[in-house]
Amino acid sequence: MRKLKFIFLNIFIFSILPIQAEIPIVAYFGIPLEYSNVNRFKEFKEAGFDVSICFYDDTPVDTLLRILDDAQKSNIRLIISSGWVSVQPHVGIPRLKNHPALYGYFLQDEPWPKDISETKRRYQAMAKQDTKKPTYVNLLPNYGDGMPREIKMPPYKQYLQQTSAIGLPFISFDFYPIMKSGIRNTWYSCLEDIRQESLRTNKPFWAFALCTPHCDYPQPTIESLRLQIYSNLAYGAQAIEYFTYWTPKPTDEWDFHDAPISINGHRTRNYKLVKQMNQELRDLLPLFDKAEVLTVNHMVKIPEGTTKLQRIPTNIKKLKITGRQGAIISTFKKYGHLYMAIVNKDYLSDMELNISAKKNVTMITKQLKETTAKSKYKIGGGDILIFKLK
């Protein structure tokens, strides 16, 4: 009888969540035109990606349709950047929009404040041709890299409100926090602003992780990827984007190298790394898909623009963090249950957690199994620990 009860419990745990989440794992700068074929899309899928943002310039629409056919064979969907989409949407979009492998259309990356009105005009022209599939615009981070000095960046909240007026279906922004000198000190304040704008507009947000080293950005590790991705999820991100999958051509300003796939089409050491991260992430995503994030607080080190945890969550009696950078404490609802996610903000060292909770509190593994909560945990660099509170 005990065995039967145990089997029933496991079945129940797995049945409360969907088998596959709708949170996509996206690659910015996916497979280039000359490599866009069935085998490359299969390789892309094996790395754990769902959506490729592809830049095809003025490639004929017939060729784009062939590429979409190839992507469909590996269950990959594309966000397409092409002049036939963004410059002549009345020509390209009607022919592309019904293809099942088309996720959406790329319009612009990091629009400057002075460009927002023109971006809105172009967005409306594209959306007029397809009211169902999204048009993608990715926003600047709050540090505004790449903007000429003569162009003044407004307060970030104001910039977000200006871009929201475009009418985009979701908020996508990039922020690459981990540098050779340490973590950018405005990262979490940027996430706070993005989350608040998402709540204000009732639009989901997409967030990035950097896996392509260049300039002052170091070689990624599993710990640095975890920190970026799990911080994004703790704040409520509904898509995880990677910059990049394919190595972009280096420039005098940006010395890109060692993306998961090299500029010549060979796998680098980061292909295996990203694949490992995505395999881990895939199991967790159903829990965060469309979850309602209630609170996001910080413990130990309180970054600029964030809130210190003042009151421990429901059904938790004691919560103590021992670690250099401290933790994010996020509470969220999913299917009527209350959860708490704890993220170690230090990707270079472990963090200790001492916790006392009521008997009904359980720990959720990364495979979404409920286990008995313990009183002590060691959370690896950048890693996440999740509890079901009620």
Question: Can you describe what each PLM-predicted range is?
Answer:
Residues 20-357, 369-390:
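Glycan-processing catalytic domains of CAZymes
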Residues 7-15:
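Bacterial N-terminal signal peptides
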Residues 1-5:
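Positively charged n-region of N-terminal signal peptides that target proteins for export
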